[in-house]
Amino acid sequence: MKHIPRKRFGQNFLTDDGVLHNIILAIDPQPQDTMVEIGPGLAAMTRLLLDGVNQMHVVELDRDLVERLKKTFDPKKLIIHSADALQFDFSTIPVPAGSKLRVVGNLPYNISSPLLFHLAEMAPHVQDQHFMLQKEVVERMVAEPGSKTYGRLSVMLQWRYHMELMFIVPPTAFDPPPRVESAIVRMIPIEKPLPCDQTKLEQVVLKAFSQRRKVIRNCLAGMFSEADLIEAGINPQMRPETISLAQYVALANRL
């Protein structure tokens, strides 16, 4: 029986064999990998990953798809977690000593940003992440200071990860086709992020970008004096999108 994609789950199923092949090449699954796929859907990518790994985990919210997966795959090869990825504790997935988790998925575009922040909590225990996301989101993730797309997502994720836009995927590669272009991003956790309290960095970045058209002196008024900004190497007349990650970290360390 054909599964009807559900809007509330943000379901757009990848159906293009060429794109799937390129994703698998980028991931390069190895037999001993501890692999977890978020939102396997109709298992187009799952099947190809299982050709390369001995066993893998999937996290799927749609109960109909969970039942389909259970009927299709050997439970010793595919371990299914019927759960919301936003609430799922990825640390519960057993990983052999000396190994780290590899995370992949065609992420639902309607929850992509909160899901990326949720996964960032697991960064020290992750080898890498390969995700299909809305192209615009990936461009924001990898944006450099001074660009229009540079913002909170850029700063917070670049503090945690080395990131690369691998390639762009057209809407025609999906069923149903989304209204936007998609892209594959590779995320490799930084072993030693710049020393900083994450909560303080979040506070500074959130306040700075809440009024991105203003100069940073006005954005952060009440949090930092003009002298604080200068001592952190920041011209008070700069705008939030021109300030580097290192400069935001320097500010957070002054709180």
UniProtKB/Swiss-Prot annotation:
Superkingdom, taxonomy of origin: Bacteria
Gene from which the chain derives: rsmA
Family the UniProt entry places it in: Belongs to the class I-like SAM-binding methyltransferase superfamily. rRNA adenine N(6)-methyltransferase family. RsmA subfamily.
Lineage, uppermost ranks: Bacteria, Pseudomonadati, Pseudomonadota, Betaproteobacteria, Burkholderiales
Identification of the protein by name: Ribosomal RNA small subunit methyltransferase A
Primary location: cytoplasm
SUPFAM superfamilies: S-adenosyl-L-methionine-dependent methyltransferases
Protein residues bound to S-adenosyl-L-methionine: 12, 14, 39, 60, 84, 106
Keywords, comma-separated and alphabetical: Cytoplasm, Methyltransferase, RNA-binding, rRNA processing, S-adenosyl-L-methionine, Transferase
UniProt xrefs under Gene3D superfamilies: Ribosomal RNA adenine dimethylase-like, domain 2 (1.10.8.100), Vaccinia Virus protein VP39 (3.40.50.150)
One Pfam family, short name: RrnaAD
Disulfide bonds: none
Protein role: Specifically dimethylates two adjacent adenosines (A1518 and A1519) in the loop of a conserved hairpin near the 3'-end of 16S rRNA in the 30S particle. May play a critical role in biogenesis of 30S subunits.
